[in-house]
């Protein structure tokens, strides 16, 4: 087990398991992307150690925020991280999000968020341990599973926000629409201007009308290789 790491001086702090993924840009950017979506009740699907859960709790102290995580050690760590940052931890459920009907009430949330595994099970390099493997590939949760859970949990007109890889964007859109979630907002994340995107931030709306807003790309570095003003703002630098 590692000690606590602060995301920025005086900001949220996190403890993570040895061998798990370190604090990721993905969850930080998704939290910033989702923070402006109007919501009083939010749930994080596959919350892991709670980076996204804590960041949204920090950004939206007026909201009730819950999480579900299949791995008991990660769920316990999420509760610890929530408590360490002064937030209630009772809303973190240890369970399989594919069993959403047994775990939750339909239409209970205004906003569903997720930083899911990016790769199909068995593709690419296998992670060295189960925790990293579960965070990397879809052995416990496919895109279809995720979107089915999001549809069930999200109220009519509510939002589903996630981060994913650009090469799977068409799959994400198809899975969302199959489950009645219309893609409404898209933002590409690029390391620098002119580079191919390496992440996509997506918001869909349950029962939404067609029409997709494509936002300007989020650039991580400027022409000199320094953090952009937007990244510095996100990280409170």
Across the structure, where does each feature detected by a protein language model lie?
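Conserved SAM/SAH cofactor-binding pocket of Class I
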Residues: 32-125, 148
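SAM/dcSAM-binding transferase cores
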Residues: 196-237
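General small-molecule cofactor/ligand-binding pocket signal
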Residues: 15, 66, 93, 184-187
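Conserved Class I SAM-dependent methyltransferase catalytic core
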Residues: 140-191, 195-197
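Mobile active-site "lid"/loop adjacent to the S-adenosyl-L-methionine
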Residues: 116-145
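Class I SAM-dependent transferase core
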Residues: 1-37
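A structural micro-motif
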Residues: 12, 40, 63, 90, ...
């Amino acid at each position: 087990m590692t000690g606590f790491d602060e995301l920025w001086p005086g900001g949220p702090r996190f403890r993570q398991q040895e061998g798990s993924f370190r604090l990721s840009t993905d969850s930080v950017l998704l939290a910033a992307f989702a923070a402006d979506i109007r919501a009083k009740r939010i749930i994080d699907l596959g919350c892991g150690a709670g980076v996204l859960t804590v960041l949204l709790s920090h950004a939206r102290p007026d909201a009730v925020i819950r999480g579900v995580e299949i791995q008991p050690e990660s769920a316990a760590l999420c509760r610890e991280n929530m408590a360490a940052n002064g937030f209630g931890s009772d809303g973190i459920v240890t369970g399989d999000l594919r069993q959403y009907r047994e775990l939750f009430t339909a239409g209970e949330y205004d906003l569903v968020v997720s930083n899911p595994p990016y790769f199909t099970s068995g593709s690419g390099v296998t992670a060295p341990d189960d925790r990293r493997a579960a965070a990397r590939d879809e052995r416990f949760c496919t895109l279809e599973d995720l979107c089915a859970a999001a549809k069930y949990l999200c109220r009519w007109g509510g939002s589903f926000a996630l981060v994913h890889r650009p090469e799977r964007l068409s799959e994400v859109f198809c899975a969302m629409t199959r489950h009645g979630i219309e893609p409404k907002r898209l933002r590409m994340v690029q390391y620098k201007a002119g580079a191919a995107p390496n992440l996509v931030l997506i918001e869909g709306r349950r029962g939404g009308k067609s029409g997709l807003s494509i936002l300007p790309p989020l650039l991580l570095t400027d022409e000199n290789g320094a953090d952009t003003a937007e990244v510095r703002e996100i990280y409170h630098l």
